[in-house]
Amino acid sequence: MAFCTSLGVMMETQLYIGIMSGTSMDGADAVLVRMDGGKWLGAEGHAFTPYPDRLRRKLLDLQDTGTDELHRSRMLSQELSRLYAQTAAELLCSQNLAPCDITALGCHGQTVRHAPEHGYSIQLADLPLLAELTRIFTVGDFRSRDLAAGGQGAPLVPAFHEALFRDDRETRVVLNIGGIANISVLPPGAPAFGFDTGPGNMLMDAWTQAHWQLPYDKNGAKAAQGNILPQLLGRLLAHPYFSQPHPKSTGRELFALNWLETYLDGGENRYDVLRTLSRFTAQTVCDAVSHAAADARQMYICGGGIRNPVLMADLAECFGTRVSLHSTAELNLDPQWVEAAAFAWLAACWINRIPGSPHKATGASKPCILGAGYYY
């Protein structure tokens, strides 16, 4: 497939944009990806737009049942799509590109409800508006098709991780630490699979916001001042989600701040609770990998959690010498770019009619072409 550049030059490879805003709700990442049909060639640029505090509060409010939810969700979808369009425009400008240079834009949207047990997952984005604002063919609503085929609708990234990061000689694990942590297991000679291991940054961020009025614990500075509370850690690890077989997925519906508070007596040191939450994330990841990929010796990490040295130290301590920890940067993809790049890749799969569904990870009955497309 060829496309025209702003200078009218015909190119044989294609450019895609992926836009992702995750459960941390900190902002929107956009990544520029070059493809040759369904073949990945590389990521070439990135832009990030932080969420204004007001927008973030509105999104968090929508996590809980309340009045006028339908109207609020539609208005927020429009506001988000304007922010996504701004992020895409900044990315194009930074790369000296025009909208006609882009074959398609893949947009995940902002998850506000994830209920696979009821067959739905809600990501806010006004996709026709986004196509109109960007003047780029837009693909979105990626999770619904997998859910319709009986899957969890999550995680969607194992197929992308498989396409980029598989090693033909040994099992690799890819760990994404966003608000929720998820793993992709890439065994040689067998289909990839994966699942949500539990909270990633979500509880740590929520605790930091509640007790220090900061968006997150930068560089793990607050957690580093605390000590692990063994009894609290044990109670958190006893949650039945962690003993459920995969495929499985989770979200704020299960692991919110009010859930954590049911395990507290109110007298705990705030630094100690935060330190315990870091170990909680690390231990649940370690337990999941030990159960699902006991032969894995390498784990590649992406997502915002990689910037937290306390969490990284906890992971290293939990795994010991059994598994070596690496950044996806060692596999030529910046750890902050991976998730957004995945949705550019899924848009390319849609354009080329390639199933992008990791049905072995989600539990869907068959591979599916994910998403719906909107012309501008």
Curated annotation (Swiss-Prot):
SUPFAM superfamilies attached to this UniProt entry: Actin-like ATPase domain
Keyword set, alphabetical order: ATP-binding, Carbohydrate metabolism, Kinase, Nucleotide-binding, Transferase
Keyword Nucleotide-binding part of the UniProt annotation: yes
EC number: 2.7.1.170
UniProt entry tagged with the keyword Membrane: no
GO terms, molecular function: ATP binding; kinase activity; phosphotransferase activity, alcohol group as acceptor
Catalysis: reaction(s): 1,6-anhydro-N-acetyl-beta-muramate + ATP + H2O = N-acetyl-D-muramate 6-phosphate + ADP + H(+)
Biological or metabolic pathway of the protein: Amino-sugar metabolism; 1,6-anhydro-N-acetylmuramate degradation; Cell wall biogenesis; peptidoglycan recycling
Pfam families to which the protein is assigned, alphabetical: AnmK (PF03702)
Residues binding ATP: G22, T23, S24, M25, D26, G27, A28, D29
GO biological process, one term: amino sugar metabolic process
Superkingdom in the source lineage: Bacteria
PANTHER family: ANHYDRO-N-ACETYLMURAMIC ACID KINASE (PTHR30605:SF0)
Function summary: Catalyzes the specific phosphorylation of 1,6-anhydro-N-acetylmuramic acid (anhMurNAc) with the simultaneous cleavage of the 1,6-anhydro ring, generating MurNAc-6-P. Is required for the utilization of anhMurNAc either imported from the medium or derived from its own cell wall murein, and thus plays a role in cell wall recycling.
HAMAP family (UniProt xref): AnhMurNAc_kinase (MF_01270)
Similarity-based family: Belongs to the anhydro-N-acetylmuramic acid kinase family.
Name by which UniProt lists this protein: Anhydro-N-acetylmuramic acid kinase
